[in-house]
Amino acid sequence: MSDQDSSTSSTSFPKYLEHLSGDGKAIGVLTSGGDAQGMNAAVRAVVRMGIYTGAKVYFIYEGYQGMVDGGSNIVEAKWECVSSILQVGGTIIGSARCQAFRSREGRLKAACNLVRLGITNLCVIGGDGSLTGANLFRKEWSGLLEELAKNGEIDSDTVKKHAYLNVVGMVGSIDNDFCGTDMTIGTDSALHRIIEVVDAIMTTAQSHQRTFVLEVMGRHCGYLALVSALACGADWVFLPESPPEEGWEEEMCLKLSENRARKKRLNIIIVSEGAIDTQNKPITSEKIKELVVTNLGFDTRVTILGHVQRGGTPSAFDRILASRMGVEAVLALLEATPETPACVVSLRGNQAVRLPLMECVQMTQDVQKAMDERRFDEAVKLRGRSFEGNLNTYKRLAIKEPDDKIPKSNCNVAIINVGAPAAGMNAAVRSAVRVGIAEGHKMFAIYDGFDGLANGQIKEIGWGDVGGWTGQGGSILGTKRTLPGKYLEKIAEQMHSKNINALLIIGGFEAYLGLLELAAARNKHEAFCVPMVMVPATVSNNVPGSDFSIGADTALNTITDTCDRIKQSASGTKRRVFIIETMGGYCGYLANMGGLAAGADAAYIFEEQFDIRDLQSNVMHLTEKMKTSIQRGLVLRNENCSVNYTTDFIYQLYSEEGKGVFDCRKNVLGHMQQGGAPSPFDRNFGTKISAKAMEWISAKLKGSHGTGKKFVSDDSICVLGIQKRDLLFKPVAELRKATDFEHRIPKQQWWLKLRPIMKILAKYEASYDMSDVGKLEPVHNHGELSAI
C-alpha cells in the first residue's frame, strides 16, 4: 500500500493490526552509535511485535560491525530472549562504531549476510549517523545484490525475491539532538541521572555555601544542559546553540553575588560539554571555576558527570516511548512498499508519527551548520519549538529584571493548590510567581486550599520566596480536598477584601470541581468575575481537558521502580506471581502505563470491564508461562477497577487456581505514589505549563485594571492542558460534557489506545487500532507545545 493509499484508508474505515501480516518476512534489528537507556525496551518491542505478526526477527549484534562480519553476529530472536530486559540500561545486542560499513566493500558483505537469511527489513536504533548509513545502504541495495549475483555469491532468483530493502529508524540518543522528534530514546533517563546528582550536590553545597559547576553531556546540543537547568533552577547555563553575549563574565558574577546577597547558600552553574562563546571558542568548566574564584572568591567545585548520564535504569517515560516506537517501527516495515521512503518513528506531543528520515537528518545537520556559521538565533529555531520554549522560559525564571524596569500592572493574582499532593506542584507555583512578577503583577499565595482562602490565609509572595522550590515534592503551600461550595460567601469576601484580580488553581479533580462551583456562583458573587485558570496536577491523571497532569510521571516512576524490585524477588523465588495495587481512583492510567513500563502480564482497570472468564484466561496464560524459562508473573490492578474483584479476591483466586504451578503474593503500593522528589518531566512540565497559564492571565487582564471590567464569559474560566500536540485553554463549561462525574474521569482517554500494546508484548491476542498511524508526515508539522 502506498503512503497515499494508507492515508486515504485510515480516514475511510478503521485499520486494524489484523489486516497486516509478517508471514514470510524477516526483520533485522540493530543498535548503533552511542548507547542510550531504553534501547532494550525498543529491541524487546520490535522482537515481540515482529513475532506476533508472524515475521522472523533477527538480532544483529554489535551494530553495523556485526552486519558486516555476519556469522554468529546475526541470530534469530525468540520471544523469551527479550524477557527481563526492560529495566536494563544500554543495549543487550551491543553497539559499535564501524569503519568497514563506510566503504562499499563493507556494505557488500553486509548485504550478502542479510540476503542469505532473507532479511529485507531493517530496524535501526541509533543517532543521525547510523540512520544516514542505513538510508545509503537502502539506496544501494539493488546494486549490491546485482554485484553479488555477478560474483556468483547469490543466484538471480534471490535478487528478484529480495529486490528491495525497507528501513525504519528509531532515534536512540541521550542528547535529544535529532530534529523532528520531541524526545529521543534515552534523554529522559539521562535527565534523571543529572537531576539525581544535582539534588545530591545541593545538600553539600548548602552546608558549605559553595558554588558548583556541573558539566553535562551534549557536544553539539544543549538540550540536557538547558532542561536540567530549568529543572533545578540553576543560576546560569551555557549552551552551544545560545552562547552568552560579550561581557558575560561580569554579568554572571553579578548574578551569582546578587543571589548570595539574598541569603542563597549555593550557586549552581550548568555547562554543556560543547559550550562555546560567540566566536565559537570553547567555554570550559575549569575556565568558569577560575572566573568565579578570581572575581568573587567563592568556594567553587567542578563536577563532570560523564558516562553516568548514559547508565542506570531507564525511566518509565523512556520504556513507554521505546515500546511505542518499537511497535510502530514494525508496523511501518510491514506497510512499506518499494516506493516508501526510509522513515524515522518520532514522538510529537503524545503521538507516535512517521517522518521522512533524510529530511530529519538534513535538518539536524542544518543546526550544526548554523552554529558553525555563528547564526545562533537560527540554530535555536531549527532545534524546534520545544527547545526555543525551554530557553525562553529559563531566561524569564532565572534572571529578575530590576523593579524600576518592570511595568506595573496594578493587578493582584492569587495561586492556590487544591486536591491531593502531587510532585511538581511546587515547581508550578515557583514558575507562576516569577512569571507573574516579571509581568508586573503582585502575586499572592493561598495556604491550605479553599479552607485557607475562606479563612484569609493569603500572603504576598516574592521572587526570592520561591527559590529552591523546583525540586521539592508535595505541596509547600499546603493542599486540601475541600470544595469551595460551603464557603462561597467567605471566599468571595476574602477575594474582594484582598482585591484579587485573577486566580490560578493548581490541582486535581477537586480543583476542576471547585472551578465549576466558582463558575456557577459568578452570578451571585462579583468577586468570582475574574479570569480563573486551572493547571492539572494529580498522580491519577484524571482531569478532563488534558492528556497529562503534573505528578503522574513521578508516580509512574515510583510504580515502575517498585515493580522492578518485585520482579527481581519473583525471579529469585521462581514460579511466583505478584499482584500489585496502584492508585488512581477510577482512572486506570497508572495501572495501564505502569504495566507497559514494567512489562506486566496483565493490568486490570475500570475503563475496560472484566469478568471471571478474563481472570481465568490470565491464570491459564500464567500457567503456560511457568512452563517456559520465564517463571514469574506480574499483574497490576487499579484500586477501583471493580467493586467485587478486589485485590484480595484476585490474590485468593490466583493462589487457588495456581496451586501446584505457582504461588502468589500481593502488594498495595499506597501513598508512596504521591511522594518523593519530582521527576525531571514533572518539574519541567509544571514549570512550562504554569508559565503559559500566567501569560494567559496577563493577556486577559491587560488594560482591565481600574475599568471595573467583569469577566463573565465562558472563556475566562478555563482548564489548561495538552491534548495530542496542542496546548489548549478549554472553558470548564465545555468540559462538563466530556466528564464522567460519578467516576471522576474524562469520558475519552487517549492512553486506552496503548492498551493493546501492553497485551501484545505480554503474549496475548489483541485488536490494535492503527487508524491514527500510517501517514508519513512533514517534518515541520509541529503543535503548540511538545511534551517536555
UniProtKB/Swiss-Prot annotation:
Modification N6-acetyllysine, positions: 395, 486, 688
Residues with glycosylation annotation: 540
Catalytic activity, as annotated: beta-D-fructose 6-phosphate + ATP = beta-D-fructose 1,6-bisphosphate + ADP + H(+)
Record carries keyword Glycoprotein: yes
N-acetylmethionine: modified positions: 1
Start and end residues of each stretch annotated as C-terminal regulatory PFK domain 2: 412-788
Assigned protein family: Belongs to the phosphofructokinase type A (PFKA) family. ATP-dependent PFK group I subfamily. Eukaryotic two domain clade 'E' sub-subfamily.
Subunit description: Homo- and heterotetramers. Phosphofructokinase (PFK) enzyme functions as a tetramer composed of different combinations of 3 types of subunits, called PFKM (M), PFKL (L) and PFKP (P). The composition of the PFK tetramer differs according to the tissue type it is present in. The kinetic and regulatory properties of the tetrameric enzyme are dependent on the subunit composition, hence can vary across tissues. Interacts with ATG4B; promoting phosphorylation of ATG4B.
Protein name, per record: ATP-dependent 6-phosphofructokinase, platelet type
Organism, scientific name: Rattus norvegicus (Rat)
Lineage: Eukaryota, Metazoa, Chordata, Craniata, Vertebrata
